[in-house]
Amino acid sequence: MTLHEVLAEAVADLDDVEAIEATEGVEWRRGWRPFAAAGGGAAEFRLDPLVAKAALRTPDTESSNRGPDWVRFGPQALDGHAVDRAEAWLASAWRRAAT
């Protein structure tokens, strides 16, 4: 299973989400607000600044060029820990997009 597939499965359980397909992957929006994207073996999440700061201290993360509150996650291995982080950050980003 790929990171994109993991997130697509997780996002199916969330309400009020629109998937915008693009050549580089998919962007998920809640209402008009983008909150996550996936493609090319990586994902990006729009997180609360405090959550983003903590996320950037974990393996396989870096700042995203989408903005200061976005974190790029490109795990070397898609193990249980990577899946847990991706799903948690997806849910956090989705909740934040409602505000």
Language-model features: locations:
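Charge-dense, helix-prone N-terminal extensions
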Residues: 1-99
